[in-house]
Regions:
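Low-complexity, acidic/polar, glycine-enriched regions of mature
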Residues: 2-239
């Protein structure tokens, strides 16, 4: 084999190592997706007393207006399965934005109403920058449609009035606007009132095709499922 032939072989081997290493690196980075949104553990009475919180500091009921806090603990995101080249099982891609605002009202101790949540989709990030760019430029086209909104279609009546520190569940109907398209969605929410805060978590099953979203393939991703989930954890503080 001449010098030119050897150089070609070396070049092919190097290219294979680079590409193979890239696939392995991508696969290793996507092997551990963050878990779905879940309620934080209920604060203990002892912890509240240690922090100087007393019954006089906290309202007796959660009634009133609440707003999403701005300390970065709230997020709205997505979960979707993507198939990577040369891997047998799909990877669950997860992206989140902590740029979330919104308000809700609690009335009569057991009714949630006037909910409106907005998320800045240009701030969505995952463990892969190429995925994030594909979502911004194609997919969600968040440069063109930067905001997602969720509103209640009607008030949610809880089965029981919330007790401080205890988990409650609520079901209802909302209106989700993504990619310039608004559709009704079924809501199955879990929440916990912890005196000065209320945390609400949930997942909304959606189909990208319902919102005219083209799955944004990139790099080693050969296919993306149409079904996805809007995943969120919202921490509210009293206004």
């Amino acid at each position: 084999m001449g010098r030119t032939g050897r150089l070609v072989v070396v070049g092919v081997v190097v290219l294979a190592l680079v590409l193979g290493g890239g696939y392995l690196l991508f696969a290793s980075r996507t092997s551990d997706s963050p878990p779905p949104a879940a309620l934080d553990p209920a604060p203990s009475t002892t912890a509240g007393q240690a922090a100087g919180t007393t019954g006089a500091d906290i309202a007796a009921t959660p009634d009133g207006t609440w707003q999403v806090n701005d300390d970065g603990s709230s997020y709205v995101g997505y979960r979707v399965k993507e198939q990577l080249a040369f891997l047998d099982s799909p990877n669950e891609a997860v992206g989140r934005s902590t740029a979330v605002t919104g308000t809700m009202e609690v009335a009569g101790g057991d009714t949630v109403e006037n909910v409106r949540i907005e998320a800045d989709l240009t701030r969505l990030t995952s463990d892969e920058s190429r995925r994030d760019n594909a979502i911004r430029l194609r997919g969600l086209e968040s440069q063109r449609y930067p905001t997602a909104t969720l509103e209640l279609a009607e008030p949610i009546r809880l089965a029981t009035a919330p007790m401080e520190g205890q988990e409650v569940r609520g079901q209802g109907t909302g209106r989700l606007t993504v990619h310039g398209v608004t559709r009704e969605v079924a809501l199955d929410l879990r929440g916990r009132w912890s005196g000065s805060t209320i945390q609400v978590v949930g997942q909304l099953p959606v189909k990208m095709s319902d919102y005219q979203i083209q799955p944004p393939r990139f790099g080693p991703v050969v296919s993306i499922e149409d079904g996805a989930a809007v995943d969120f954890s919202l921490v509210f503080e009293r206004v």
